[in-house]
């Protein structure tokens, strides 16, 4: 299985990333260094409210939720957006429509440099528009805090939001994400996200208990590497659903019997519909209560009920069965009256009021609280989670007085009863722990929980998984604060699929294959250059570069300097094509003349045309001048060509050298080196020394830089191994192998394929490394000497030895000497 080696060079073309040329051996498996997954909580870290988390991996950035803090207002309620560059975010996923998860989305989309795409489920988008419109109405006009955004900003952001169906997978720039049912509220979703092979599960707010209209949260089929999980209730435990409902209806029934009023602060959407279903069914079963009115006070009451009536098919079997069998819509309540405000509310006698907002910070629920607080017959039932810093959290402690919303200095006496009965549809410890077991993720990041609850949950989980420590299933748990970064290292292993002509040929182990790796998002393809247009849509071209420099040096000097740098330079003679062509033309012309002359001689019946000696001499002079002219012109066309590293050609003429190469990073580097050498040939001291003559005549000298023959290299290889291992290196009698024996350890080198066998493995590995290094040492830089060449060299040496023993070599040498003497005599 091959790994990448060497230096990676890449450049981007459109959506594709071309990763140079690489050599791969065996299977095409890409491995790279550790990649870091980053998680930052801009909100919702060790707190409940303004949920906003950012994950980054492999150059992709995803934001999860964009809410506000219900205990604050204005800019103070926003997540810490200033701590992150929002322009780098590719995708923003909204889990559900609650204000602490979605209310700052218009601010992000319209007031910042955010450029990504936003996704949420269809019901969430349907409710988002009306819920945030009410949020703008309630929060606008405050003198102390500027408005976060306007109605126009909300409308503009709404038009940019895209929707996703449950169980459908979408892909954006290589990031895949899928929505699953999360329970909690209508349209709530948990998301599985896959980025560069790393799988993440973000639960958002979720419930593992089926209620009257929603299914419980699903367990995604994939096993995530990272779980981002809510910790709202920490280690707390909920009452069973039926017991909670009985206690709720019992409290309401007893309050009405004693002539009091019941106030149930809720969010306008979500848990309010669940409570209304419970109350409507209870009133149907108890005719004695039907004289008391149930009010649902919300400016969005009718609009929101219409949304719930629209998305019945996304609810549980109970609601769909009632809709199918009874032919009625369960959300068309029989005993519940909708009111937008308190202007026409007849505050006389016992009643039940379900009013928003749920945190009692302002609005109808806060007004009624201050109005009903002094009467001990009244009851306040908190059905949702109370966030730290809100009136709902404060009144749980049952203070004697509460401040007025309009004038905090004005105190209102509290005499009404306060009961907390959670219908918040969040998981308790048992449900959360079971879900974490089913998901079975090694890395768990806790969010959306107050500090104490989150720390208790972390401690409980660590105690539960203590037995998995130092095992493959060991779990790591994080509970970061806001703006604290969590980094997790993942080693990515990616497979490059061969396509095109390269995929048609089945490679064998050990084969070297050259191609281009093309990356699109997180997918890799290995193909030949010729297949780029067909499979990727990219056109290719080769740039032939040429440069001519003045070089006043002969062929020998140029060859000498190139060999000093590159070790081996292939030399090719450039034939004088011009002279040969002209001589051929002259020969053909003369042949035509002879044929023509023969024809004339036949037709003239033996007549012979006399030519004077002067005319013959004149023609000979013209031919001689023509020949000299041709030979003079041949100096510019004849020359020598050198090939350096099989990539750069150097055409040498008496006055210049022309360098040609196909443009690439490697070829450009070689060409630069060749050019630098040619520019220094003239003034090099070595050139002066070599070109000077110690005698008046010119003759050849021994070339000290000539390339060694194959036989010499084979002997050099054996000498290197002998020097490395000393007396332990012994060549076998047949010369086909060599043994290296050190104490009880022994390794054998086979000269047939230059393989090493023996034991123990460390010795075999060391000997193999020595053989490989020796092979690379006996050949020049530019000439690759394969094991096959060396094996042939060994065979040639053995053949010569055998022939010497048989006397064949001596006879051949004598015949060769006689042949040379005969040639000299003939000369």
UniProtKB/Swiss-Prot annotation:
GO terms for cellular component: mRNA cleavage and polyadenylation specificity factor complex. InterPro entries: Beta_Casp, CPSF73-100_C, MBL, Metallo-B-lactamas, RibonucZ/Hydroxyglut_hydro, RMMBL. Keywords: Endonuclease, Hydrolase, Metal-binding, mRNA processing, Nuclease, Nucleus, Zinc. The keyword Nuclease applies. GO terms for molecular function: 5'-3' RNA exonuclease activity; metal ion binding; RNA binding; RNA endonuclease activity. Its EC number is 3.1.27.-. Zn(2+) 2 binds at residues 100-101, 205, 448. The active site is at residue 426. The keyword Metal-binding applies. Pfam families: Beta-Casp, CPSF73-100_C, Lactamase_B_6, RMMBL. SUPFAM superfamilies: Metallo-hydrolase/oxidoreductase. Residues 606-621 have a biased composition (Basic and acidic residues). Residues 583-592 have a biased composition (Acidic residues). It is found in: Nucleus. GO terms for biological process: mRNA processing. Residues 583-621, 802-827 are annotated as: Disordered. Zn(2+) 1 binds at residues 96, 98, 184, 205. PANTHER family: CLEAVAGE AND POLYADENYLATION SPECIFICITY FACTOR FAMILY MEMBER (PTHR11203), CLEAVAGE AND POLYADENYLATION SPECIFICITY FACTOR SUBUNIT 3 (PTHR11203:SF11). Belongs to the metallo-beta-lactamase superfamily. RNA-metabolizing metallo-beta-lactamase-like family. CPSF2/YSH1 subfamily. Component of the cleavage factor I (CF I) involved in pre-mRNA 3'-end processing. This is Endoribonuclease YSH1. It comes from Yarrowia lipolytica (strain CLIB 122 / E 150) (Yeast). The gene is YSH1.
């Amino acid at each position: 299985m091959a790994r990448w080696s060497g230096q990676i060079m890449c450049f981007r073309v459109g959506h594709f990333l071309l990763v140079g040329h690489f050599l791969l051996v065996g299977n095409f498996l890409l491995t790279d260094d550790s990649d870091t997954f980053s998680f930052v909580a801009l909100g919702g870290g060790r707190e409940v409210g303004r949920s906003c988390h950012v994950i980054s991996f492999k150059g992709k950035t995803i934001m999860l939720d964009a809410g506000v803090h219900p205990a604050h207002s204005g800019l103070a309620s926003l997540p810490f957006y200033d701590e992150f560059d929002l322009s780098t975010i590719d995708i923003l996923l909204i889990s559900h429509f609650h204000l602490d998860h979605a209310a700052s989305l218009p601010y992000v989309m319209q007031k910042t440099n955010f450029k990504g795409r936003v996704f949420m489920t269809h019901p969430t988008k349907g409710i988002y528009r009306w819920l945030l419109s009410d949020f703008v109405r309630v929060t606008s006009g405050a003198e102390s805090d500027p408005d976060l955004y306007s109605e126009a900003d909300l409308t503009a952001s709404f038009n940019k939001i895209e929707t996703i169906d449950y169980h459908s997978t979408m892909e954006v720039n290589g990031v895949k994400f899928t929505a699953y049912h999360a329970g909690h509220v209508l349209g709530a979703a948990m998301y599985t996200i896959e980025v560069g092979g790393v799988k993440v599960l973000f639960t958002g707010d979720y419930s593992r208990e089926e209620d009257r209209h929603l299914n419980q949260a699903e367990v995604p089929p994939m096993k995530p590497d990272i779980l981002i999980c809510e910790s709202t209730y920490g280690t707390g435990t909920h009452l069973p659903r039926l017991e909670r409902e009985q206690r709720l209806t019992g409290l309401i029934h007893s309050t009405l019997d004693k002539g009091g009023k019941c106030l149930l602060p809720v969010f306008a959407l979500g848990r309010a519909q669940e409570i209304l279903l419970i109350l409507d069914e209870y009133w149907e079963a108890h005719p004695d209560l039907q004289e008391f009115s149930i009010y649902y006070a919300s400016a969005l009451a009718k609009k929101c009920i219409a949304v719930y009536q629209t998305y019945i098919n996304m609810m549980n079997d109970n609601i769909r069965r009632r809709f199918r069998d009874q032919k009625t819509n369960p959300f068309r309540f029989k005993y519940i009256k909708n009111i937008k405000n308190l202007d026409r509310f007849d505050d006389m006698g016992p009643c039940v009021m379900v009013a928003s907002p749920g945190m009692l910070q302002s609005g109808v629920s806060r007004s009624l609280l201050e109005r009903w607080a002094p009467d001990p017959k009244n009851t306040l039932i908190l059905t949702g989670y109370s966030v730290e810093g809100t009136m709902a959290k404060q009144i749980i402690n049952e203070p004697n007085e509460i401040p007025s919303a309009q004038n905090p200095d004005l105190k209102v006496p509290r005499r009404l009863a306060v009961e907390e009965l959670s219908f918040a549809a969040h998981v308790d410890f048992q449900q959360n722990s079971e879900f974490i077991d089913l998901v079975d993720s090694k890395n768990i990041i806790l969010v959306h929980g107050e500090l104490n609850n989150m720390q208790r949950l972390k401690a409980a989980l660590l105690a539960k998984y203590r037995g998995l420590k130092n095992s493959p299933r060991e779990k790591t748990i994080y509970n970061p604060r806001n703006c604290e970064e969590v980094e997790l290292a993942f080693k990515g292993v990616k497979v490059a699929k061969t396509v095109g002509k390269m995929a048609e040929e089945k490679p064998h182990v050990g084969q070297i294959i050259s191609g281009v790796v093309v990356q699109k998002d997180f997918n890799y393809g290995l193909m030949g250059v010729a297949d780029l247009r067909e499979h990727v849509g990219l056109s290719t071209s080769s740039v032939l570069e040429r440069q001519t420099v003045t070089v006043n040096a002969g062929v020998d000097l140029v060859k000498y300097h190139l060999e000093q740098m590159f070790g081996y330079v292939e030399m090719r003679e450039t034939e004088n094509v011009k002279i040969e062509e002209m001589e051929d033309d002259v020969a053909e012309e003369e042949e035509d003349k002879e044929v023509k002359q023969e024809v004339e001689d036949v037709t003239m019946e033996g007549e012979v045309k006399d030519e004077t000696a002067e005319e013959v001499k004149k023609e000979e002079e013209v031919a001689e001048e023509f020949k000299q002219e041709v030979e003079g012109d041949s100096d510019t066309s004849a020359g020598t060509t050198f090939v350096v590293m099989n990539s750069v050609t150097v055409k040498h003429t008496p006055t210049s050298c022309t360098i040609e190469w196909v443009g690439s990073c490697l070829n450009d580097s070689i060409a630069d080196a060749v050019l630098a050498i040619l520019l220094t040939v003239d003034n090099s001291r070595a050139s002066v020394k070599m070109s000077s003559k110690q005698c008046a005549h010119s003759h050849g000298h021994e070339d000290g830089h000539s390339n060694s023959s194959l036989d010499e290299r084979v002997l050099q290889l054996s000498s290197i191994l002998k020097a490395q291992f000393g007396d332990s290196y012994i060549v076998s009698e047949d010369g086909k192998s060599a043994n290296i024996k050190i104490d009880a350890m022994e390794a054998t080198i086979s000269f047939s394929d230059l393989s090493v066998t023996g034991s123990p493995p460390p010795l075999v590995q060391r000997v193999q490394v020595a053989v490989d290094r020796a092979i690379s040492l006996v050949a020049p830089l530019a000439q690759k000497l394969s094991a096959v060449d060396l094996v042939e060299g060994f065979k040639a040496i053995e053949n010569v030895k055998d022939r010497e023993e048989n006397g064949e070599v001596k006879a051949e040498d004598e015949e060769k000497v006689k042949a040379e003497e005969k040639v000299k005599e003939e000369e």
